[in-house]
Amino acid sequence: MIRHRLLAAAAVGLLTAVPALPGTALAGPRRDGLRLCALHPLPLPAGVTHGRATAVDPTGRYVAGIGTRITDGVWEPVLLLWQGARVTAVDTALAEDVVGVNSAGVVIGNAYVTAMQRPWRYQDGRLTDLPVPGNVSGAWVAGINGRGDIVGHGAVEATESSIALRWPADRPGTVETIDTPPDGAALAVLDDGTVVGNARFSAGSSSYAGWVRRPGGQVVRLTVPGRPNAWVLAARGGWAAGTTGDDPDGDRSPVRWGLDTGKATVVDPAVEPVQDVTAGGVLLGLRAVWHADGVTPLPGAVAGFPDVQARAVTDTGTAVGWTTTDRLTPVRWTGC
């Protein structure tokens, strides 16, 4: 619930003004059009009429997403997994929310099952529910690393709070609670086991900040000087990316943090809301890519159908998402 609420709250206008913040670096000038950014539709299986690419592994080997099969007027969800030009379709009601895939082709997602949110994993052709602690009323996955460790969070109805969760790859069928600041939610897990997420500043506080938990247990907060709130939405390599604002429902500014220093840099508003970050620190927004030397808009909008939505990016800069015309078309962007 926490991650979904943060993502929804972050979805504000792309042209929000970004004031300079005390103690915060402001990115350089915007220089559009410096890159040859190309759009490539992804193939859909026979009988699947709509599709969205929502996840890609850092190497670009696998892309995962959601399709729709219409049978006798009934729209049925389909889990889609691309490997190059080949696409695998899995008809399942669990394909409501596909949030991650790693370089081994393990896909993770969430679905509403028997009156509660439940996480799942697709691996080696099998869909399985992930275990959840007995004290949570719903659970969500948010990130997976190269070896298959999965992180997310659970909602504890009794205390109206959230706890960060990890499903370790080396202990299949188990789930463990991650020690975090109050009301914690894990958003990403790096290949070395570092976990990144969000939590309240303190118990009872209305302000949020990001956090980084190293494998040894050390926890560092990710904040933006001069702002009461900061939320991490993605992390990879030595970088985290997210958003900052004075009010959870107010204007937002996209931010990049260096995980080694915790330094925050407010970047061009064209990438708000932030969707992903590469190991090299490139930020993906809903409709644009931010590099240190400028911003590149993502092509794909056509007259009457202006919507393109990117969701994830590889470490080599290939982004995936979808375009909207009379149907949803899964796509990838290269050279952006």
Predicted features by range, described:
Residues 1-28:
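Secretory targeting and sorting signals
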Residues 2-5, 26-336:
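Residue-level hotspots at or immediately adjacent to binding/recognition sites across diverse folds
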